[in-house]
UniProtKB/Swiss-Prot annotation:
Pfam families given in the database record: HTH_ParB, ParBc
Gene that encodes it: noc
GO cellular component: chromosome; cytoplasm; nucleoid
Originating species: Bacillus anthracis
Subcellular location: Cytoplasm, Nucleoid
Species lineage: Bacteria, Bacillati, Bacillota, Bacilli, Bacillales
Identification of the protein by name: Nucleoid occlusion protein
Amino acid sequence: MKNTFSRLFGFGDKESEFELQDESHEEIDKKVYEEIQEIPIVNITPNRYQPRTVFDDARIEELALTIRTHGLIQPIVVRQYEDDKYEIIAGERRFRAATKLGWEKVPAIIKNLNDTETASVALIENLQREELTAIEEAVAYQKLIELHNLTQEALAQRLGKGQSTIANKLRLLKLPEEIKSALLEKSITERHARALIPLKNEELQLKVLQEIVEKQLNVKQTEERITKLLEEAKPKRKAKQKAVSRDTRIAMNTIRQSLQMVADSGLNVNSEEEEFDEYYQITIQIPKKK
């Protein structure tokens, strides 16, 4: 079943030109294939809109060995942006594998796409592969929202995802860079990162991040730690003070003034006031000898 890219993101007559298929999300409709060309690798640059920021060297090496054995079955897809200069639309992993093999040229199909279309294809193609980290996925959603001026709900409908899925991913982008880096490097999981969001305070978030990594805290332990920190941060409730009658105030002030007069006379008087629910207690100590 085809997931027509142009229908989802409103590229009008481009529908017949570019389609993504469930069987191979990088595959361009064969009916509109241009002739495959051999393009020098030095003339090709990665997609500037590529959401993937971390490439697994081991998996690229595996792909390179497969290509060496079986050849490059699926050409990469590029667009020309200057004379003899091309930008990858789809197939950066294949491009990297071919580069690792030392190829001078790589089979490619040239498509005529503008910046918005190129960015959208790269983002959608990677999202459908479900190999992105949580942060890369969040960045891809944010870019699609900006490119097509969509709401979270509209994007969710176009991608066939729940709005809460989109919203939860986008919240990760508000976290400090150190936490996002930890997610990219897979030092912590997405659930760890999401547990940190309620803390708000960046210093506390980074403190807990350090604890997660150093103590190898699981998600439950992390959530319990954060719950404790949130409880500690709550303002303490002040005890409700009962109204004091005028007569009581006069009595207290009279006693205090009397004690001050005694002290002024040179006698060392110690006093202590205590407040209870129903009464005040004043304890006075007067020395027998001056």
